[in-house]
């Protein structure tokens, strides 16, 4: 166990995409970074690319045993956690190989299989909360700590309720609504922890070309990761913030709930 002068971060789903870019930026800013990946070999391959003080850690946020093992490793090696980045998510649980349009069409509230909602929400909502709750004791042991959860502007009720929003038809019952639920739970957590040394932030990336959308996003992973990286590195943001890219957000990148 080392002293708590080191900045120690864990990023879930960090072997690729936005999570990988966040891990890279944290390493460049003197963090020790645990690279969470369901497949440990993929995590180790990412660490080979990242170098520095990166460490691969097997982490399936839908598996309580995997979460418990990850907590034990961090506790044994450092005894605390400075930053938890909740990035792991899935966009669907249906037939692979479909286009983004096919996936979104099948996720409309009138026809979406409840089994698919359960599968996606198990990762995006319940798994994310389970991981966070498990690491709270180690976050409390840091002098100050932050939880940064990657959400989506697609989960904003205010944006989707606006008839002038050209993208409102993309708000679906599976992925989009999972981000709405995620926002609500983590705003509740921010309120719960507001008198502690732990800040809670939600952040939306751009429409990034990643495996989450079959690489059909309009932003490069580097461009789309800019706002999550900014939030992950910012230590002075007020707790309970929800920010995103400039095309949806207002002053100071603030998104409406």
Model regions: which residues?
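Canonical Rossmann dinucleotide-binding motif of NAD(H)/NADP(H)-dependent dehydrogenases/reductases
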Residues: 2-34
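Conserved glycine-rich Rossmann-like NAD(P)H-binding loop of the short-chain dehydrogenase/reductase
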Residues: 29-45
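The beta1-alpha1 cofactor-binding region of Rossmann-like NAD(H)/NADP(H)-dependent oxidoreductases
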Residues: 40, 58-72
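A glycine-rich helix->loop->beta "capping" turn
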Residues: 52-55, 73-86, 92-97, 104-105, ...
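Hydrophobic positions on the long internal alpha-helix
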Residues: 85, 131-135, 139, 185-186, ...
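Catalytic loop of short-chain dehydrogenase/reductase
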Residues: 90-121, 140-194
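C-terminal helical subdomain
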Residues: 180, 195, 202-203, 210, ...
């Amino acid at each position: 166990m080392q002293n708590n002068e080191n900045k120690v971060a864990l990023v879930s789903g960090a072997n690729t995409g936005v999570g990988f870019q966040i891990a890279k930026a944290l390493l460049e800013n003197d963090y020790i970074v645990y690279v969470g990946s369901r497949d440990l070999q993929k995590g180790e391959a990412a660490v080979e690319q990242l170098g520095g003080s990166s460490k691969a850690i097997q982490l399936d946020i839908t598996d309580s045993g995997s979460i418990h093992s990850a907590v034990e490793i961090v506790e044994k090696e450092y005894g605390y956690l400075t930053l938890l980045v909740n990035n792991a998510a899935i966009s669907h649980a249906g037939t692979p190989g479909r286009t983004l349009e096919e996936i979104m069409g099948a996720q409309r509230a009138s026809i979406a299989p409840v089994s698919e909602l359960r599968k996606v929400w198990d990762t995006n909502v319940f798994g994310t909360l389970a991981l966070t709750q498990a690491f709270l004791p180690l976050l409390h042991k840091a002098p100050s700590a932050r939880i940064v959860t990657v959400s989506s502007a697609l989960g904003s009720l205010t944006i989707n309720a606006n008839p002038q929003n050209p993208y409102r038809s993309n708000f679906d019952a599976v992925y989009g609504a999972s981000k709405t639920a995620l926002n609500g739970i983590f705003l509740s957590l921010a309120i719960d922890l507001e008198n502690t040394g732990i800040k809670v932030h939600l952040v939306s990336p751009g429409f990034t070309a990643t495996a989450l959308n079959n690489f059909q996003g309009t932003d490069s992973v580097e461009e789309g990761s800019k706002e999550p990286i900014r939030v992950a590195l910012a230590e002075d943001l007020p707790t309970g913030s929800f920010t995103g890219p400039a095309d949806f957000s207002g002053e100071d990148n603030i998104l409406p709930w």
